[in-house]
Every structure is written in structure tokens, then in C-alpha cells.
């Protein structure tokens, strides 16, 4: 796999989702990543640290530049816990849990997050404002309600199916109510 092409395609997908999700500075963005799927394999079967590092490093750089906080979801072997910066966990009052990811328990994305983040910690759950799912990892449990599906500009990254979610406030009040404009569904 050409890692330069992978990086550029991941960047294109990410920037599309960041723009259309209307995520703001200081908000949380969740990444679910199966490097096995990116390489054309079955989720959890052929994890690649190299692929995880390329994707996570890129996403962390792009989001950090915009002041958006990245949380990287792990696999079911660690109950889909998330890696993020300790300062973000404190800011959002998230309970830190004790687990260290490995290639087959947490995955390559989490290992990369531990490598590239300044003070990485694990938390059990978040309510992110938006997220990107590379390889059908099921990020929905970590995106706040009301979730709005976004179809990425490119639906595959390598061999992995790519989906995304944004979120918006609930619309309440019924037929007489009026609402603020929806920045996601312009």
C-alpha cells in the first residue's frame, strides 16, 4: 500500500467531514479505525501499526491545528475505550481508566495515539460532536445525540468502508415551534 496516497486520501476525507459537520474549536472528534480493513482484510485480523500511525498522525495534526480534540476509539477487547489527551479528559470531566492498548487489544490507532499525543489517557466513554469511522468500527456509541450521518467525499480508504457522523441539538416543540438554522444540513 502506498502510504503517501493513503495519507492524502485520509486528509481529503477528514477535511470534508470537518467542514460539513460544523464541528467547532474545543469540541470532541472521535476516530474509529481498522487498519486491517484499510489493508483489505477483516477487522481485527491483520492490524498494521504503520497504517495506524500514518492515519492517526495526520488526523491529530489537522484537528490540533483547528483546536479540535481527537479521541481514538479502541476495539471491543478494551470495551471501546478511547485515547485522548489528559487535559481534555480533565476539561470534559471524564473518568480516566487504566488500560494500555496493544495491537490486538485497542488496535493500531490507539497505539499511534499513545505515540503522538503529549499526555495520552484512556476513558470509557465520551459524547463527541462528530466522528469518522474507517472500517466499520461502530463509533455511534461515542457521538452525542442527535446523530446526523454524513456520506464522505470518498466512501473507501484503501479497502475500508468509511462513514461519518455529526451531531445537532434535538428539535423540540412541535408544529408551532421555530428553529435555528441547521449548519449541517445547509
UniProtKB/Swiss-Prot annotation:
Q: Which HAMAP family match?
A: UPF0340 (MF_00800)
User: What domain of life does the UniProt record list for this protein's source?
Assistant: Bacteria
Mind telling me what this protein is named?
A: UPF0340 protein SEQ_1951
Mind telling me which InterPro entries this protein's record contains?
A: Antibiotic_NAT-like, DUF436
Family statement drawn from the similarity comment of this UniProt entry = Belongs to the UPF0340 family.
Amino acid at each position: 500500500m502506498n502510504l503517501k496516497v493513503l495519507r492524502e486520501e485520509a486528509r481529503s476525507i477528514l477535511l470534508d467531514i470537518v467542514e460539513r459537520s460544523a464541528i467547532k474549536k474545543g469540541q470532541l472528534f472521535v476516530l474509529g479505525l481498522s487498519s486491517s480493513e484499510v489493508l483489505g482484510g477483516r477487522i481485527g485480523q491483520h492490524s498494521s501499526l504503520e497504517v495506524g500511525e500514518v492515519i492517526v498522525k495526520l488526523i491529530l495534526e489537522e484537528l490540533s491545528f483547528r483546536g479540535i480534540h481527537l479521541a481514538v476509539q479502541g476495539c471491543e477487547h478494551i470495551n471501546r475505550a478511547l485515547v485522548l489527551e489528559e487535559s481534555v479528559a480533565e476539561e470534559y470531566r471524564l473518568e480516566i481508566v487504566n488500560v494500555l492498548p496493544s495491537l490486538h487489544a485497542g488496535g493500531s490507532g490507539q497505539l499511534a495515539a499513545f505515540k503522538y499525543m503529549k499526555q495520552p489517557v484512556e476513558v470509557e466513554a465520551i459524547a463527541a460532536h462528530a466522528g469518522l469511522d474507517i472500517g466499520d468500527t461502530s463509533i455511534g456509541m461515542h457521538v452525542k445525540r442527535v446523530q446526523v450521518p454524513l456520506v464522505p467525499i470518498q466512501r473507501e480508504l484503501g479497502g475500508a468502508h468509511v462513514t461519518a457522523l455529526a451531531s445537532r441539538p434535538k428539535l423540540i416543540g412541535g408544529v408551532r415551534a421555530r428553529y435555528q438554522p441547521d449548519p449541517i444540513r445547509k
